[in-house]
């Protein structure tokens, strides 16, 4: 569950290291984002010579949350951290690599490019 002011790790090689959620997209009073949802983020920490700079505002897809993800078969999956992947206006990832596992719930939300770049899909 990601809300405004939540800090997330960046799970790609776009150059950003930490981002902060400044808006959850999808409805005027939408409060929480889960895996696969699109949020607006501000870049808080970036590496030198990366594709993005500190202070930029971008869109991102949430790929990991510390809050449980319930599956229809009754199983539960949770991660150690909150992480996101930066995307452009065409919903394509900015980076060329994804780090760490991603859940298969991203497939249902049509983020196929992220699924294909990920080293492991849980």
UniProtKB/Swiss-Prot annotation:
Database matches in Pfam families: Ribosomal_L14
Signal peptide: none
Superkingdom of origin organism: Bacteria
One BP annotation, GO: translation
The protein's name in its UniProt record: Large ribosomal subunit protein uL14
Record key words, sorted: Ribonucleoprotein, Ribosomal protein, RNA-binding, rRNA-binding
NCBIfam families linked: rplN_bact (TIGR01067)
Gene Ontology molecular function: large ribosomal subunit rRNA binding; structural constituent of ribosome
Gene encoding the protein: rplN
Classification via SMART domains: Ribosomal_L14
Subunit structure: Part of the 50S ribosomal subunit. Forms a cluster with proteins L3 and L19. In the 70S ribosome, L14 and L19 interact and together make contacts with the 16S rRNA in bridges B5 and B8.
Residue intervals passing through the bilayer: none
Similarity field: Belongs to the universal ribosomal protein uL14 family.
Known function: Binds to 23S rRNA. Forms part of two intersubunit bridges in the 70S ribosome.
GO CC field: cytosolic large ribosomal subunit
Keyword Ribosomal protein set for record: yes
Protein's organism: Brucella abortus (strain 2308)
């Amino acid at each position: 569950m990601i809300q405004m002011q939540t800090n997330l790790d960046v799970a790609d090689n776009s150059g950003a290291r930490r981002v902060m959620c400044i808006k959850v997209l999808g409805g005027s009073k939408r409060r929480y984002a889960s895996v696969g949802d699109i949020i607006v983020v501000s870049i808080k920490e970036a590496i030198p010579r990366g594709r993005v700079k500190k202070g930029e505002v971008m869109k991102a897809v949430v790929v990991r949350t510390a809050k449980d993800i319930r599956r229809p078969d009754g199983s539960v999956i949770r991660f150690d951290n909150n992480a996101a992947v930066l995307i452009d206006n065409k919903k394509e990832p900015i980076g060329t690599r994804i780090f760490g596992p991603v859940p298969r719930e991203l497939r249902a939300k049509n983020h196929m490019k992220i699924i294909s770049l990920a080293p492991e899909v849980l």
